[in-house]
Curated annotation (Swiss-Prot):
The chain crosses the membrane at residues 3-23, 55-75, 86-106. InterPro entries: NADH_UbQ/plastoQ_OxRdtase_su3, NDAH_ubi_oxred_su3_sf. Core subunit of the mitochondrial membrane respiratory chain NADH dehydrogenase (Complex I) which catalyzes electron transfer from NADH through the respiratory chain, using ubiquinone as an electron acceptor. Essential for the catalytic activity of complex I. The keyword Electron transport applies. It holds the Pfam family Oxidored_q4. This is NADH-ubiquinone oxidoreductase chain 3. It is found in: Mitochondrion inner membrane. GO terms for biological process: mitochondrial electron transport, NADH to ubiquinone. Belongs to the complex I subunit 3 family. Its EC number is 7.1.1.2. It catalyses: a ubiquinone + NADH + 5 H(+)(in) = a ubiquinol + NAD(+) + 4 H(+)(out). Core subunit of respiratory chain NADH dehydrogenase (Complex I) which is composed of 45 different subunits. Interacts with TMEM186. Interacts with TMEM242.
Length: 115
C-alpha cells in the first residue's frame, strides 16, 4: 500500500509540474534575448551556422554503439552468477550484434567523414 501511495503521489506531482510548465511559459521575446551573445560585443558574423548532417549521423552512431558497450559493463559481476554459460553466451551474442552493426555501417559508408 505504501508503494502505491508513493507512486501515485509522484505521478500526480510530475503531471502537475508538466502541466504548469506548459500553461505558464514565458514567451516574452525581444531582440536582446534572441540575439547571440559574444562577450558583450555585437556579433561579427552569423551565429546560426548550418549544421553538418554527416557529423550528426556519426554522433548518433557513436551514441548507439556507446550505449551497447555500456550494456557490457556489468559483465564481470554477471559472471559470478549461477548460470555462467548463459551469461557468456548472451554477452557473446551482444558483441556479435555490435560487430554486425559496425560492418553494416562500414558497408553503407556511414563512417566516412568526407564523400
Amino acid at each position: 500500500m505504501n508503494l502505491m501511495t508513493t507512486l501515485l503521489t509522484n505521478t500526480m506531482l510530475t503531471s502537475l509540474m508538466v502541466l504548469i510548465a506548459f500553461w505558464l511559459p514565458q514567451t516574452y521575446t525581444y531582440s536582446e534575448k534572441t540575439s547571440p551573445y559574444e562577450c558583450g560585443f555585437d556579433p561579427m558574423g552569423s551565429a546560426r551556422l548550418p549544421f553538418s548532417m554527416k557529423f550528426f549521423l556519426v554522433a548518433i552512431t557513436f551514441l548507439l554503439f556507446d550505449l551497447e558497450i555500456a550494456l557490457l559493463l556489468p559483465l564481470p559481476w554477471a559472471i559470478q552468477a549461477n548460470n555462467t554459460n548463459l551469461t557468456l553466451l548472451m554477452s557473446f551474442m551482444l558483441i556479435i550484434l555490435l560487430a554486425i552493426g559496425l560492418a553494416y555501417e562500414w558497408l553503407q559508408k556511414g563512417l566516412e567523414w568526407t564523400k
